[in-house]
């Protein structure tokens, strides 16, 4: 069911907000011991807020659009008075004194916080295995990863533990887990949504977006969280349009570009490629025109990203030293030793690896050879996209080269892990909006994701085409429920 359908049930008093919240917590208790999607539940406050909304509804008060709708929030978004750990020992006890802009907008719209979801430590990972508090499993197959870094949010939505969730996307961290878990994941244009209160990984790449079970719901959540924020200087001062305005309009005549560099990649699974091309043909049958386009530097995205993102991370994470807050190693003789050991024990191996890479790339003697060069390539990648959008309205690729891989299978091969974001990273480098929509299954019954990429601030068109595909392909609601999670 969509958020609109749940809202109708609530307004018709077929179910109360409290009953809906209680149903969600009952389901979480039934299955999350197997999934580990949540790090922390907010049961008391959720029930109190649900009762308050029920009372307002009974009194006939006009309610905001998400009144009574249960949400989960990735645990790198600050929630005032609620622990925000980034799945790191470094922030294990951190309780923010302020609310992130996106969560504040959700609560003002009536949404209810069920809890905080698991992620790769400081959002650095593609499998939700680097969490200091244990890995999350994929609800379609518990032996596989849910993707990352927002794997907890994706798994929670896919298994019906919440109606929607927020995640963050730095190089594919919403879209790749959405693909692996068979849900919708939307990364807005950089600056469309405020980053205030999002614990920074790579500030020029991070963006907040929703996980939902339908494109319609993704549009509705974006409607609430988008818009100018004086607390975030990178947030665009642009009008927020009606993101579902074009849903009823035909897509006949729209030009959709197939990026040939993506489909020529040797590392892409044949089943993934076939499923995505079938989805492209479905869009063609709806009247869209398919055009082959070239983004010559698309495949340089991985190398570029793994210079820029770690460089920004090394600067952003320098503040965690055990002095003012964060994990502190006691018993050391001096400040330098305490800081060094606090960081060594507070950060996991993947975070340490990226800090080292970033520090090296920014160091004197290597800045020009690595960081400066990567920024130049980033500009060229953005230019390739801009050239493509002179010929087409949207771009189409697989979301990920493969379906969900086995947990632990990439432990000793960081490069293989990094390559799982091969098709999503260039979008972040260019600051473009993109969405992952389920488009089929492989022979093992694992979901495959279709990625649609829009031009800057092109979310309306992006969501329109994704919605038309979703309706025509009848993929909405193909999510695992209790029967797909072994007892």
Swiss-Prot record:
Gene3D superfamilies: Amidase signature (AS) domain (3.90.1300.10). InterPro entries: Amidase (IPR000120), Amidase_CS (IPR020556), Amidase_dom (IPR023631), AS_sf (IPR036928), GatA (IPR004412). It is an enzyme of class 6 (ligase). One of its GO terms (biological process) is translation. Signal peptide: none annotated. One of its GO terms (molecular function) is glutaminyl-tRNA synthase (glutamine-hydrolyzing) activity. Pfam families: Amidase (PF01425). The active site is at residues 74, 149, 173. GO terms for cellular component: glutamyl-tRNA(Gln) amidotransferase complex. Its EC number is 6.3.5.7. Keywords: ATP-binding, Ligase, Nucleotide-binding, Protein biosynthesis. It catalyses: L-glutamyl-tRNA(Gln) + L-glutamine + ATP + H2O = L-glutaminyl-tRNA(Gln) + L-glutamate + ADP + phosphate + H(+). Belongs to the amidase family. GatA subfamily. Heterotrimer of A, B and C subunits. HAMAP family: GatA. Allows the formation of correctly charged Gln-tRNA(Gln) through the transamidation of misacylated Glu-tRNA(Gln) in organisms which lack glutaminyl-tRNA synthetase. The reaction takes place in the presence of glutamine and ATP through an activated gamma-phospho-Glu-tRNA(Gln). This is Glutamyl-tRNA(Gln) amidotransferase subunit A. The gene is gatA.
